[in-house]
Amino acid sequence: MQYRLLGNSGLRVSAIGLGTNQFGGKVDQLDTAQIVSGAIDLGINFIDTADIYQQGRSEEALGVALKGKWDKVIMATKVVSPTGDGPNDKGASRYHIMQNVEASLRRLQTDHIDLYQMHRWDNDTPLEETLRTLDDLVSSGKVRYIGASNYAAWQLARANLLAEVRGWVPFVSIQNHYHMFEREQEREIIPFCNAHNVGILPFFPLAGGFLTGKYKRGEAAPAGSRGENSPYVQKYMTDANYDKVEKLTAWAEERGHTMGELAHAWLLAQPSVSSVISGATKLSHVQANAKAADWALTAEEFAEVNGVLNGE
């Protein structure tokens, strides 16, 4: 496994991370334990969850699975999204953050969170309040690093500039939606992160499975797959996208790799990507994703792939 620095920090995370939004739901406790142990054996040390995944059950499942293994992982979780029906059960206020960090620590059965991420921007809470609270959590030792998620470039820039002026800890990472067919991040987020050394953590790297190549043009989606009923996956099922996947699948296979490995390797070729967060519901998914860390695209290969993606 390859390890990379998490943005402008000394923390090293595995190039392939483990996404756990289905843990505690579709993935039961037995499978969670198997997947987590298997991921650690493969060298994956970065695990990402959130307080809202499966209404907190993802964190609970991880807390059980990671007993005796905390020294082998870097745990990331998130706050801001609604966790209840009360008026203060959401947002980036000091009240909600302080309440929820304690709840996450209880569910995870640990005394600290390695990377605490703001799940989205909060228009209702003064940024100063949010950042001061996060700085206090780092000072207390309950949180070691902070990150953002689903932020625009101007929001990330404003937050880190304010943190610099006030002497508070900055966001070291940004977790946003980014893959071969979702490239909006290349307009502003990626240039900003490259310039200011903020680590990028792409999520949904396989476009819900479409970038594995398992969905075939003109064929029904496999029974039980997301492609059967997920609008997110189905929106990628266009002739133009099938053309690209078919070409890239053949290109990858000529080099002894799969389309899924190429989708990960392409993200890892981006300069500021620290870790690609790959969700898994089976150990075999983790094993397949981990192989991508060993494939470093050359500049020429990267250009060839971009040529296909750009329709050249």
Feature map (PLM): residue ranges:
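Active-site-proximal loop/turn and secondary-structure-junction residues that shape catalytic pockets
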Residues: 22, 53, 79-83, 117-122, ...
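N-terminal binding-site loop/beta-alpha segment at the start of enzyme catalytic domains
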Residues: 1-74
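N-terminal small/glycine-rich loop or linker at the start of catalytic domains
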Residues: 7-23, 76-89, 112, 117
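Beta/alpha (TIM)-barrel catalytic core signal, keyed to glycine-rich beta->alpha loops juxtaposed to Asp/Glu
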Residues: 125-312
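Active-site groove signature of glycoside hydrolases
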Residues: 105-125
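Alpha-helix N-cap and loop-to-helix initiation/capping positions
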Residues: 27, 31, 61, 88-99, ...
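Short, acidic/polar
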Residues: 27-39, 92-108, 156-160
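Acidic-and-aromatic substrate-binding clefts and catalytic sites of carbohydrate-active enzymes
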Residues: 24-28, 50-59, 122-126, 153-154, ...
